[in-house]
């Protein structure tokens, strides 16, 4: 009977720790990942910098930051996004 109780306790602790680990990963989705792409015109003159989202994110995205500090999630395959990245890279030179 004692070994059955220990086995159940170990299973409970393992289940709790796995649930906690997956919940911690899910909390980052809204902050560091894009859930949708911006569909409007990209204000190239107002862009300051850009970065690619993590490979752990559900959607591959390029995030632009504007001079006002606004973050814009965009589709990396979009031709306007590629043009904006080239513009920002040329500004650094």
UniProtKB/Swiss-Prot annotation:
Which GO BP annotation is one of this protein's?
Answer: inflammatory response
Q: Name one Pfam family in it.
A: IL8
GO CC annotations on file? extracellular space
Highest rank taxon of the organism: Eukaryota
Which InterPro entries does the protein's record reference?
Chemokine_b/g/d, Chemokine_CC_CS, Chemokine_IL8-like_dom, Interleukin_8-like_sf
Q: Which UniProt keywords apply?
A: Chemotaxis, Cytokine, Disulfide bond, Inflammatory response, Secreted, Signal
> Which region is the signal sequence?
1-23
The disulfide bridges present are 33-57, 34-73
State one molecular function term (GO).
chemokine activity
**Localization of this protein:** Secreted
What family is this?
Belongs to the intercrine beta (chemokine CC) family.
Q: What is known about what this protein does?
A: Chemokine, which displays chemotactic activity for T lymphocytes, preferentially Th2 cells, but not monocytes or granulocytes. Therefore plays an important role in a wide range of inflammatory and immunological processes. Acts by binding to CCR4 at T-cell surface. Mediates GM-CSF/CSF2-driven pain and inflammation. In the brain, required to maintain the typical, highly branched morphology of hippocampal microglia under homeostatic conditions.
Q: What is this protein called?
A: C-C motif chemokine 17
């Amino acid at each position: 009977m004692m070994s059955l109780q220990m086995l159940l306790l170990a299973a409970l602790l393992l289940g709790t720790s796995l649930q906690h680990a997956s919940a911690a990963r899910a909390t980052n989705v809204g902050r560091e990942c894009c859930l949708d792409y911006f569909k409007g015109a990209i204000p190239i003159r107002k862009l300051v910098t850009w970065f690619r989202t993590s490979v752990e994110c559900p959607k591959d995205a390029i995030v632009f930051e504007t001079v006002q500090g606004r973050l814009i999630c965009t589709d990396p395959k979009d031709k306007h996004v590629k043009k904006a990245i080239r513009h920002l890279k040329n500004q650094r030179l």
